[in-house]
C-alpha cells in the first residue's frame, strides 16, 4: 500500500515538529549548562578527529585514546562533514535530533498508509513522544541515534514483507555499536520465522560472526589493554543469574512500559522479539543505569515496538483499540518529561551561575589544553584540547578548570591537585561561584 501525498505531508510535519521540539530541548539544556554526562563531549572529540581526517582520538578517555578501542561506532564519522561546516557541541546534539526526526517520518508514513490517516497519525505522535526518545534526547547525543532510522526502515520493510530490504537496512546497524549484532541476529530469526529460512539464517549467522570479530579482534586491537573493556559488566562479580534478579521490580516495570506504550499490541507481532537482546544485556549488566527507563538505553526499542504495533494492528484490525491505550500510557509518562518542561517559563531562565561559567571558559585561550570535570566539559571541546579529571594520565594541561559546587566530587584546591597530578606550578586565576580555574606557569 502506497502512502498518499497527504500522508507524506502529515508525516513530514510531524517529523519537523519533533525536530523543533527536541532541538529546543537539546539547545536549552546545553545553554543552561545542564549536566547529563560527558558523553556528548566524547562524541564531539571523536567527530572532531574524523573531521580533521584523523583517527577518532578521544583524549577525554585518556591521552591519545582511540575510541574504537572502547565502543565500535564508526558510523559517527558520518557527522564529520557537518561538523567541518559548523564545529560545535550543538552540531552533535542536533545530529541526534535529525536522526530521530527521520525515524519519526518513517514510522508516521508506515502507520498512516497501513492503518489509515487518523489512527496512523495518532501512532506517529505516540512514537515521537515515547519515553525512549525523550530520555535519549535528555541524555545528549549517543551513537544509538543512528539505529533509530535504520530500525524504522527495516521494520517498515518487514511490515511490507519486503525481506530483501529488511536485510539491506539491518546490516548497517553493525556499524552503530557492537551490541547491535545481537539485534541484527534477532532480525534474522524473525525472517526465519516468516519463512525466509536461508536469508534469515544467513543474516543471523553473519551478525554473530561480525559481532565476534568486533569484540575479539577489532576493539581489543585499538584498546591499550588488548581487551573489550565492558565484558566484566555482564553479570558483574556475582554472575548473570544473580544480576538478572537484582531490582526485578524496576526491570519488570521497564519491560512492561516498553510494550504498554503500544497498548500491548506490539506483543502480537514477531517483530517484538527484537527487544529481547537489548533487554538481555541491560538486565544482565551489573550497571543500575541500564535497568530503568532513563538515559538513552531504550531509544533502540522505540522503533521496534512501534513497528511491531503497526504490524499487529495491520494484520489484526481488532487490535486497533490499542491506540488509545498506548496514548494514555504515553500521556501519563509525559507529566515530568523534558518536552513538558518546555512549557515552564523557568526553563528559559539563565541559571544563577551561568555568567561565572561563561567567564571561566573565556579565560581559557582557543587551542589551549585544559583538564576539567563533567561540569563544563561539553562546552570546551570545540576549541580546546580537553582532558577529563580521572583519565588525564601523563598529560600536562595548561589549564585546570573544575566546578567544585556541582556535587560531583571535584577537588576544591584546584592548584594543589594540578601540581600533584601534573607537576610544575599552577596558579588560580579565577574563582567565582564554584568555578575555579588554575593556569600552569
Could you say what each language-model-derived stretch is?
Residues 1-24:
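Start-transfer (signal-anchor) and selected internal transmembrane alpha helices
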Residues 12-16, 204-209, 314-338:
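Signature aromatic-anchored transmembrane alpha helix within multi-pass, membrane-resident enzymes
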Residues 21, 25, 32-35, 49, ...:
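Membrane-lumen/periplasm interface segments of specific transmembrane helices
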Residues 90-115:
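Transmembrane-helix motifs of polytopic, lipid-linked glycan transferases
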Residues 102, 106-109, 126, 145-169, ...:
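Specific aromatic-rich, kink-prone transmembrane helix
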Residues 136-144:
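Short acidic/glycine- and proline-prone juxtamembrane loop motifs at membrane-interface regions
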Residues 273-317:
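Hydrophobic/aromatic-rich transmembrane helices and adjacent perimembrane loops
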Amino acid at each position: 500500500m502506497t502512502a498518499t501525498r497527504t500522508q507524506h505531508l502529515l508525516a513530514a510535519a510531524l517529523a519537523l515538529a519533533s525536530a523543533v521540539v527536541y532541538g529546543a530541548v537539546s539547545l536549552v539544556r546545553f545553554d543552561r549548562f545542564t549536566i547529563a554526562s560527558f558523553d556528548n563531549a566524547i562524541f564531539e572529540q571523536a567527530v572532531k578527529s574524523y573531521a580533521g581526517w584523523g583517527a577518532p582520538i578521544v583524549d577525554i578517555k585518556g591521552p591519545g585514546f582511540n575510541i574504537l578501542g572502547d565502543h565500535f561506532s564508526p558510523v559517527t564519522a558520518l557527522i564529520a562533514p557537518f561538523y567541518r561546516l559548523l564545529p560545535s557541541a550543538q552540531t552533535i546534539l542536533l545530529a541526534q535530533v535529525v536522526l530521530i526526526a527521520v525515524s519519526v517520518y518513517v514510522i508516521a508514513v508506515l502507520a498512516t498508509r497501513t492503518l489509515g490517516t487518523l489512527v496512523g497519525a495518532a501512532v506517529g505522535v505516540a512514537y515521537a513522544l515515547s519515553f525512549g526518545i525523550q530520555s535519549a534526547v535528555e541524555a545528549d547525543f549517543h551513537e544509538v541515534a543512528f539505529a533509530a532510522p535504520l530500525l524504522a526502515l527495516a521494520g517498515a520493510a518487514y511490515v511490507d514483507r519486503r525481506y530483501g530490504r529488511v536485510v539491506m537496512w539491518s546490516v548497517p546497524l553493525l556499524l552503530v555499536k557492537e551490541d547491535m549484532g545481537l539485534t541484527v541476529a534477532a532480525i534474522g530469526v524473525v525472517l526465519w520465522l516468516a519463512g525466509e529460512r536461508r536469508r534469515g539464517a544467513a543474516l543471523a549467522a553473519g551478525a554473530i560472526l561480525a559481532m565476534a570479530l568486533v569484540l575479539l579482534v577489532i576493539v581489543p586491537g585499538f584498546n591499550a589493554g588488548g581487551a573489550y573493556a565492558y565484558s566484566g559488566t555482564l553479570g558483574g562479580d556475582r554472575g548473570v543469574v544473580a544480576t538478572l534478579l537484582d531490582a526485578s521490580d524496576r526491570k519488570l516495570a521497564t519491560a512492561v512500559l516498553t510494550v504498554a506504550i503500544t497498548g500491548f499490541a506490539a506483543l502480537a507481532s514477531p517483530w517484538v522479539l527484537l527487544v529481547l537482546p537489548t533487554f538481555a544485556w541491560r538486565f544482565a549488566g551489573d550497571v543500575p543505569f541500564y535497568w530503568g527507563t532513563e538515559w538513552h538505553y531504550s531509544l533502540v526499542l522505540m522503533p521496534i515496538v512501534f513497528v511491531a504495533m503497526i504490524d499487529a494492528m495491520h494484520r489484526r484490525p481488532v487490535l486497533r483499540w490499542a491506540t488509545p491505550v498506548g496514548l494514555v500510557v504515553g500521556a501519563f509518562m509525559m507529566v515530568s518529561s523534558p518536552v513538558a518542561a518546555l512549557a515552564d517559563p523557568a526553563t528559559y531562565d539563565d541559571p544563577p551561575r551561568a555568567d561565572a561559567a561563561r567567564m571561566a571558559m573565556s579565560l581559557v585561550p582557543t587551542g589551549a589544553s585544559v583538564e576539567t570535570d563533567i561540569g563544563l566539559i561539553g562546552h570546551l571541546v570545540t576549541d580546546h584540547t580537553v582532558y577529563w579529571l580521572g583519565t588525564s594520565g601523563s598529560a600536562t594541561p595548561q589549564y585546570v578548570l573544575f566546578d567544585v559546587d556541582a556535587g560531583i566530587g571535584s577537588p576544591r584546591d584546584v592548584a594543589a591537585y594540578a601540581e600533584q597530578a601534573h607537576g610544575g606550578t599552577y596558579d588560580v586565576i579565577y574563582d567565582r561561584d564554584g568555578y575555579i580555574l588554575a593556569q600552569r606557569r
